[in-house]
Swiss-Prot record:
GO terms for molecular function: rRNA binding; structural constituent of ribosome; tRNA binding. Part of the 30S ribosomal subunit. Forms a loose heterodimer with protein S19. Forms two bridges to the 50S subunit in the 70S ribosome. Disulfide bonds: none annotated. Located at the top of the head of the 30S subunit, it contacts several helices of the 16S rRNA. In the 70S ribosome it contacts the 23S rRNA (bridge B1a) and protein L5 of the 50S subunit (bridge B1b), connecting the 2 subunits; these bridges are implicated in subunit movement. Contacts the tRNAs in the A and P-sites. It comes from Malacoplasma penetrans (strain HF-2). Residues 103-117 have a biased composition (Basic residues). Belongs to the universal ribosomal protein uS13 family. This is Small ribosomal subunit protein uS13. Residues 103-124 are annotated as: Disordered. InterPro entries: Rbsml_uS13_C, Ribosomal_uS13, Ribosomal_uS13-like_H2TH, Ribosomal_uS13_bac-type, Ribosomal_uS13_CS.
């Protein structure tokens, strides 16, 4: 496996697909990196030379990816929570942020149901 920016990318796949294993690089950015490096997208990672891998590393290091990007996203969410915006409050309460309904569904964000004891009213 080739190692680019601290991430092992698979040898048996095409370069354009393998680069998407790096957090922050999708298909379009992968194509952009390969066009700048003048490398064929259909080439397998195992067929790349060390010079080609070095150029990919150099070009990819210009972008905000992996740990820096994760940190930036976390800081953006933290900032929203600190300023008390609507989105920040939704993050703090672990509710859907983008306007989804919560009366039913939203189980992924809310987590498993919290059952309330003694809710049934006994009839006499």
């Amino acid at each position: 496996m080739a190692r680019i920016l601290g991430v092992d990318i698979p040898n048996n796949k095409r370069v354009v697909i393998s680069l998407t294993y790096i957090f922050g690089i999708g298909k379009s950015r992968s194509q952009e990196i390969l066009s700048k490096a003048k490398i064929d997208e259909n080439k397998k990672v195992s067929a790349l030379s060390e010079e080609e891998l070095a150029t990919i590393r150099k070009i990819a290091s210009e972008y905000v990816i992996e740990g820096d990007l994760r940190r930036e996203v976390a800081m953006n969410i933290k900032r929203l929570m600190e300023i008390g915006s609507y989105r920040g409050i939704r993050h703090r309460r672990n509710l859907p942020v983008r306007g989804q309904r919560t009366k039913c569904n939203a189980r992924t964000r809310k987590g498993p149901r919290k059952t309330v004891a003694n809710k049934k009213i006994e009839t006499k």
